């Protein structure tokens, strides 16, 4: 068995990551419904109270909670380290849910003092997670590619939370020396490129080979991703806030990371031994196609080939909605069945008939969710670029239907938890060699 972190004898119980993931799924459903209800405001500039509230429902409520929840299950498996404190993770979730709800509400009504208080709670919750991860990784002997990118991502998460807190305070006291919109753009790209991108790229390097039954990736894409993000993210953020000449080199560096990641994904899909792709795998692979489209549009913005708020919102939809969201949906369709099966059936395996992981899913609903969400994300990006309220509403309605199918699938998986009763549940241990 692999070594555990100092002073730790067990990994978090399955309900801890499930709690995060279910809260995130609810936020995803609300965000998709919100896209339809805000069709009118989404045809105008992106900096409006209700649009910013929607954006933070996606980035904090959906994406960030998903990544944090998944980390409580993936770190023991991918990095072979048991989590430091399950109790801290539970307290952190309460802090984050309260803070995120407060931020979204105060963004919606445009009240800055209340927003700042809620942002402070989110920053505190983020800090608690970073402490938990830091203590978990303490003493890790070898930092693999995945460990390095995840460490980079958690550092980016902390900086993004701090940056957002400063932006909120600046709306009250006006102390930041830089112009507001370039600073806002820097905050967004720090979140996207410094937090979301390294986490997805790092985890996929270990998780996708397991899911696809493919060889672990190697070669030039590893340094391309690592150095592309390590050099590109500071350059983009610094260029947007202070030195515009850095934006283009930073964009090219990030593009190199994207090319490296997509090359790995394509190789794993080509060399896989799994003959048939389930819907979770189709989601993550389709997310790669959206990443290519979003990165191309982002590079075009850096080259001044495109400009304006409509193109910027289409770029955001491709990056956060197409790539990040579809990838997370696919990962959830792989992670949640495992967590439910482990909690309900692991102690009975070998002694009584138990369902397989595949039997916990609902392929019909997953397939419907795939069709609706992929078409809805593509349609939303096109509708935002066109600035058409009817098209945005239609795309939002399709997304809402797709997210409902996704959440219904998760609910059907969670129904198996009712079989637990009062039976003692084993704790999910770290992955063994």
What are these regions (language model features)?
Residues 1-433:
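Hydrophobic alpha-helical transmembrane segments of multi-pass integral membrane proteins
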